[in-house]
């Protein structure tokens, strides 16, 4: 799948077709689907106008219910109503064994150790359950958008490992849906606010949902999001606020043991009061019990007192996660609020106080992750205008490193499909060289000065060997997101260093086309300049090598011979300063001819030294 219609300069690409793609927030409690429509990313509602879908699946004797219908079955048939299946994704039964006794499901281990739920419709695994949640979201999207989807971007927690990510991808592929990308939830939130277009800085994503709290610290550098650290509490969320309020109401109304119906009524009323306190200083709570209406006024200060310890606990998680990330509060340039529970005024106040800046809240915190995923999906199917962020499934311009003389050695050539890995070996230029500087460049020209600089780094710890003896393996890896990792490793010691960069950052289609046209326009001139630079590098290498040899073995020559070599070296050095390829080549050949006898004597001398004290038998 090519994400950008690429044509050679002067040729037109195929007419652009709008492709349908969506972003899906596959949540623990609720899930959403979003799409870019008329250049605006929006979540898509169902026929009843509801945007979120409860992540709940009920297996009956003959049918499967998903969402609100399944949620209604949770009290009546908890054993066959699966909630929070995301917690089981990619985990073995052993991983979750400690919590099994508290779960109403009948769980068994499959042949590969993964958990399976026993239901009236047979055994199902977490991947199949997740696919049931995705199914109505996909159907909603195709109905709303009026066509088949070209692909989806699904969000996952930043801390998900490979098994959990693969399980999420498999759930979509069970439905025959192409997964364009799995996107970290905090990264999706940052994209929704357009933070990916900023140059650099640290971003905190504060995610307080119904059942969990997550804090993620990201570093943004030239369009690349790096997750520095994640933290949180998997058993702390807005539901805990509700339960504290329920306990208060029970105490106020002297209700000791409510039945299931009253307990549900209390919980619904607690949620209503919590939400109403977002915009009101006080709210009257009421429930009907035994034909009697109980009322109680709850003000904001009382509610804050009830939940204060829990909010403080989330701030403690933030403090620890910043410490794990190795950054301070002052390093954080933006704070993004995710999750419906971040609407609570006390939460926003505490977050603002801790991070010393007003958090970003203009996008609905329940929908922000899905919206970010939709923006990414729109880019990945090629619907983004060329002036916007560029994401490709091919390398648009060659990637390489600078070599001696300002030359470019291409490691990954343009139009190579990604993901890709390429490696090449380089060596040292001077005797005793213990470090090597690398300059990563992008472009089609032969000289570094005509290419785009991407990054620089240095490999230290190279063994001090003769020039050309050390072997440094340089590996270029470009992942599916277009992120380039360059690693340099000295083969004998294993010492290595690496750097990451996004080659597409700040690069438009127009700039790519211009660079390609220039490479063709100046091709002949570039080859000539490259040949000249190569001859100059070779001249410098020969001079360097011969000077080292004279310093070590000058005694092997008489005075006249030494003088002739010194003159020849000076002549080559002078010619190398000029821009005459043939003259430099002749001067190198002349010096090579004059050093033949010297080289033979050095070889004989080395052999004698090696054989000294050795018997014929040993040899």
From Swiss-Prot:
Q: Kindly indicate whether the keyword Glycoprotein belongs to this entry.
A: no
Q: InterPro entries under this entry?
A: ATPase_NBD, Heat_shock_70_CS, HscA_NBD, HSP70_C_sf, HSP70_peptide-bd_sf, Hsp_70_fam, ISC_FeS_clus_asmbl_HscA
Supply one GO BP term: iron-sulfur cluster assembly
Q: Which UniProt keywords apply?
A: ATP-binding, Chaperone, Nucleotide-binding
Q: Which GO molecular-function terms appear in the entry?
A: ATP binding; ATP hydrolysis activity; ATP-dependent protein folding chaperone; unfolded protein binding
Q: Does the keyword ATP-binding apply?
A: yes
Q: Which PANTHER family match?
A: HEAT SHOCK PROTEIN 70KDA (PTHR19375)
Summarizing the function annotation, the protein's role is:
Chaperone involved in the maturation of iron-sulfur cluster-containing proteins. Has a low intrinsic ATPase activity which is markedly stimulated by HscB.
Its family? Belongs to the heat shock protein 70 family.
Q: What is this protein called?
A: Chaperone protein HscA homolog
């Amino acid at each position: 799948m090519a994400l950008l219609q690429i044509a050679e300069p002067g040729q037109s690409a195929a007419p652009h077709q709008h492709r349908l793609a969506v972003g899906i927030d596959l949540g623990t409690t609720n899930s959403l689907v979003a799409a870019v429509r008329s250049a605006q990313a929006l979540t898509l509602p169902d026929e009843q106008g509801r945007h979120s879908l409860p992540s709940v699946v009920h297996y009956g004797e003959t049918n499967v219910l998903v969402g609100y219908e399944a949620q209604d079955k949770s009290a009546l048939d908890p054993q066959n109503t699966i909630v929070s299946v995301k917690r089981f994704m990619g985990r073995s039964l052993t991983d979750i064994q400690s919590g099994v006794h508290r779960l109403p499901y009948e769980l068994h281990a499959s042949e590969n150790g993964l958990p399976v739920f026993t239901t009236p419709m047979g055994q199902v695994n977490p991947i199949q359950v997740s696919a049931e949640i995705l199914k109505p979201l996909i159907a909603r999207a195709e109905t709303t958008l009026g066509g088949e989807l070209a692909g989806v971007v699904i969000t996952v927690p930043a801390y998900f490992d490979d098994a959990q990510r693969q399980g999420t991808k498999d759930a979509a592929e069970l439905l025959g849906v192409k997964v364009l990308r799995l996107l970290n939830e905090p990264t999706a939130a940052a994209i929704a606010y357009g933070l990916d277009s900023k140059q650099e800085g640290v971003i905190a994503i504060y995610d307080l949902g119904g059942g969990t709290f997550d804090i993620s610290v990201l570093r943004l550098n030239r369009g690349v999001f790096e997750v520095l650290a994640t933290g949180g509490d998997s058993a702390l969320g807005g539901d805990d606020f509700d339960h504290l309020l329920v306990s208060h109401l029970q105490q106020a109304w002297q209700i000791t043991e409510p039945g299931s119906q009253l307990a549900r009524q209390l919980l619904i009323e607690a949620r209503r009061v919590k939400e109403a306190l977002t915009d009101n200083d006080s709210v009257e709570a009421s429930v009907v019990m035994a034909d009697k209406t109980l009322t109680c006024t709850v003000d904001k200060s009382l509610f804050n007192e009830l939940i204060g310890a829990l909010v403080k606990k989330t701030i403690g998680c933030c403090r620890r996660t910043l410490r794990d990330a190795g950054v301070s509060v002052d390093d954080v340039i933006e704070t993004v609020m995710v999750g419906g529970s971040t609407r609570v005024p006390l939460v926003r106040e505490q977050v603002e106080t801790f991070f010393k800046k007003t958090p970003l809240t203009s996008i609905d915190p329940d929908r922000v992750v899905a919206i970010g995923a939709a923006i990414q999906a729109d880019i990945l199917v090629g619907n983004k205008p060329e002036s916007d962020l560029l994401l490709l499934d091919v390398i648009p311009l060659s990637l390489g490193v600078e070599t001696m003389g300002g030359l470019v050695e291409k490691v990954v050539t343009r139009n190579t499909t990604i993901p890709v890995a390429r490696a090449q070996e380089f060596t040292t230029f001077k005797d005793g060289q213990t470090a090597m500087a690398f300059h990563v460049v992008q472009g089609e020209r032969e000289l570094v000065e005509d290419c785009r600089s991407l990054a620089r780094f240095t490999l230290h710890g190279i063994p001090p060997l003769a020039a050309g003896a050390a072997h440094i393996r340089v590996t270029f890896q470009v992942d599916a997101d277009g992120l380039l990792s360059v690693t340099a490793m000295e083969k004998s010691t294993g010492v290595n260093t690496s750097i990451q960069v996004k080659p597409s950052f700040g690069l438009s289609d127009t700039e790519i086309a211009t660079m390609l046209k220039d490479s063709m326009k100046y091709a002949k001139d570039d080859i000539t300049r490259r040949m000249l630079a190569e001859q100059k590098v070779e001249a410098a290498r020969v001079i360097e090598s011969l000077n080292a040899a004279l310093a070590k073995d000058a005694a092997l020559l008489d005075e006249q011979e030494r003088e002739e070599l010194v003159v020849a070296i000076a002549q080559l050095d002078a010619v190398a300063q000029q821009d005459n390829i043939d003259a430099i080549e002749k001067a190198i050949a002349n010096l090579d001819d004059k050093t033949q006898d010297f080289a033979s004597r050095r070889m004989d001398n080395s052999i004698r030294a090696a054989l000294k004290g050795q018997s014929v038998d040993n040899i």
